[in-house]
Amino acid sequence: GPMGPSGPRGIPGPPGAPGPQGFQGPPGEPGEPGASGPMGPRGPPGPPGKNGDDGEAGKPGRPGERGPPGPQGARGIPGTAGIPGMKGHRGFSGIDGAKGDAGPAGPKGEPGSPGENGAPGQMGPRGIPGERGRPGPPGPAGARGNDGATGAAGPPGPTGPAGPPGFPGAVGAKGEAGPQGPRGSEGPQGVRGEPGPPGPAGAAGPAGNPGADGQPGAKGANGAPGIAGAPGFPGARGPSGPQGPSGAPGPKGNSGEPGAPGNKGDAGAKGEPGPAGIQGPPGPAGEEGKRGARGEPGPTGIPGPPGERGFPGSDGVAGPKGPVGERGSPGPAGPKGSPGEAGRPGEAGIPGAKGITGSPGSPGPDGKTGPPGPAGQDGRPGPPGPPGARGQAGVMGFPGPKGAAGEPGKAGERGVPGPPGAVGAPGKDGEAGAPGATGPAGPAGERGEQGPAGSPGFQGIPGPAGPPGESGKPGEQGIPGDIGAPGPSGARGERGFPGERGVQGPPGPAGPRGSNGAPGNDGAKGDAGAPGAPGSQGAPGIQGMPGERGAAGIPGPKGDRGDAGPKGADGSPGKDGPRGITGPIGPPGPAGAPGDKGESGPNGPAGPTGARGAPGDRGEPGPPGPAGFAGPPGADGQPGAKGEPGDAGAKGDAGPPGPAGPTGAPGPIGNVGAPGPKGSPGPPGATGFPGAAGRVGPPGPSGNAGPPGPPGPAGKGETGPAGRPGEIGPPGPPGPSGEKGSPGADGPAGAPGTPGPQGIGGQRGVVGIPGQRGFPGIPGPSGEPGKQGPSGPNGERGPPGPMGPPGIAGPPGESGREGSPGAEGSPGRDGSPGPKGDRGETGPAGPPGAPGAPGAPGPVGPAGKSGDRGETGPAGPAGPIGPVGARGPTGPQGPRGDKGETGEQGDRGFSGIQGPPGPPGSPGEQGPSGASGPAGPRGPPGSAGAPGKDGINGIPGPIGPPGPRTGDAGPVGPPGPPGPPGPPGPP
């Protein structure tokens, strides 16, 4: 029977308990290695070495001892790893900073230890979205699982394959935003995991009355990161924690298998944005995962509204790209987060043909969703259009290709670069896995305006919906090729060629509702009237308590669709909610391998010459120098005076001549031999204290910035409010309608019944999403729309709500006579999407006009570009210099500094005190005397030689015989002088 009117709104249920935290997403690629820490101070010079002793002349002095090496400069203090904040949404890739000048390499800091992975939390209701994290170097996006609560980010594991999307939970009320913490250190981005095959779309349950929005679930506390556990189901995304400073990147863990997606928790209300955290240094980039095979495309969802513009991150210091890490295992999910976002809508089936709207009959069943067509590649984004009213959240499509890295920011000091990791081929972005720790954010680009939605292609008359095929399992993700220009969208079912859309006439006043006649065959479709002016958006109705979800009515036969009424007024776009708190960044990964060595800057000026070492100790005496030449023989001494004759006695014979007198004193000491070769200088005394370091030369040209790390997957901006769908072009002339049965006889018009809730409309044609397509969340139960105002004139078709899995169609009303359409029942509500991401709450939509006949979906428009990267916001303050990276391996010994200029020659050391002359050389042997030449004339007496040393006494000759005892009396001597007078005699 026809579905009854919705019951009153129920009382909101108690806040849902936070769902379990989802597993931590696999780590993104490792960020580039952080810049090296500043060089440690130079150690004090060692004490000067002792000079070597002076050698004796000729003997080289002993080299002085070398002074002990000066102590190594203190190690730079490793920066502390920032507290990991909760992970925020993935930001855009920061612009690579220009390469900074190379700083002197500091000692290697200790590598930060990787934080443990947080334990998986339960999936909670969606928390307040954090402020968009500053983008790290994006890791490749994995397939998106249901968002788990973001745990404390551990080192991100690699993205695992995405599980199938879960069903959306109820949308929770908006929670208060927590303060944004400082950004945590960025973990290395893991390699991209292969996306798992999407699960088949679930069958749509019967549409019930939408429950009221529930109270926001309590926000789960962030737990301490646990050790990496097995992956659990991803929970809803928790509130982002404060962003901590980026720590050094932790090592990349192995990627675990992705868990099955959990059910999506209720979306929490948007919180106020927290302050942006300090950006940490990027972690090393991981290698990209293989591109998975292209999954079957889901239908394109309706574009969400553009997300609000993130704050630009500060430029990170670009580190060299780290080596590609291995795929880490996923860390356990963190503590339960706040309520997760509403789940993504399941894949939509092929839209059923729009029937001609008769008076609403009882709703008929919807056709089953057909298998999804192949995924079109995301096309290039169209130019941004003005933001439209916020539509219901569409199905999230696949994320678009990674944005290119932005312009390089000013580089920080050049660290010890690691070798660049290989850039993996960009994978096709799978669904985003549970987010890894964010890389340091680059400045968030401004959100580009959303391009106007392309005008929908003419919509042909959709064929009747086929029974839904099972969703194909997506193939494995192939290795991503470059994202080419978007390929054509996969073929859709054949559509008739849309005719031109006729001008829609103004809606006539609703006549009284006739009783439903027997359903006629579809009549020819009349021209659409001109679109009515959009009604203003009514104030949102008071949110009632959620009623119980009514059982789905049994689908009645589907009535013909009436002509599309004019479009209802667009709702005003909901405000974007405040940003959630950015989640903690995982602990720093290991320092990336040192990047390429930057060019050495020019050598600084030579330091001043060290102080002159003290004179060395005197060397030991060298061996005696060669004897000086013997002096010339002293002149013969004058013959001694002849002795007085002895007392007469026979004169003893003269003894034999004494041996030759001693050689004259040595001639003057020969000149001291030229000093022997100078002893080799002792090793230089310890260098004096280093002169002040020369100014660091102007930085060498910065190395070219390494190639930008692979662009991260385009961060998913929160999908902004959907661009207003371009006005649907006038509907093409309807394709030939199916044959119109003859209309049933009109029943007498009854008084218009209250419109039964409209059966779930056939699926709307899929509008291409201009944003990146995430996987569609299953639309959360729709909040009740505000009380339905009187239907505005039916506007052109509002943007289609997200295609949920087709609800079971209510039984189609029988087609009434195709008369003036009865007042259109309010369209069955598409579930209003749970607030997606930071979407503000959707204001109550003006009641959608009855949907116009769906044009055939135009080809999927090219995916909107991720909004153009907004201009780079002013750079945020540079994050604190990341902790000094682990000390890189000692770089190759720099070229030996130029030899300092030779110090001035020290004053010649005092000549060592001349050693005492060596003992005189032994006199040369006297050559044999030559035969005496004839005596030359007696030369003038030579100058007296220095008196020789007394010769050795000659051996006394034999004593001559005693002379006679009595000599002759000598002659009488002269009389002596008179003696003194004697003393007087006695009297």
From Swiss-Prot:
Name under which the protein is recorded: Collagen alpha-1(I) chain
Complexes and interactors: Trimers of one alpha 2(I) and two alpha 1(I) chains.
Bias type Low complexity, positions: 20-39, 101-117, 141-153, 201-251, 354-380, 389-408, 422-444, 516-543, 602-614, 627-654, 662-677, 686-696, 737-752, 811-826, 923-956
One GO MF term attached to the UniProt entry: extracellular matrix structural constituent conferring tensile strength
Protein location: Secreted; Secreted, Extracellular space; Secreted, Extracellular space, Extracellular matrix
Basic and acidic residues: compositionally biased ranges: 51-65, 896-907
Organism: Orycteropus afer (Aardvark)
Tissue: Forms the fibrils of tendon, ligaments and bones. In bones, the fibrils are mineralized with calcium hydroxyapatite.
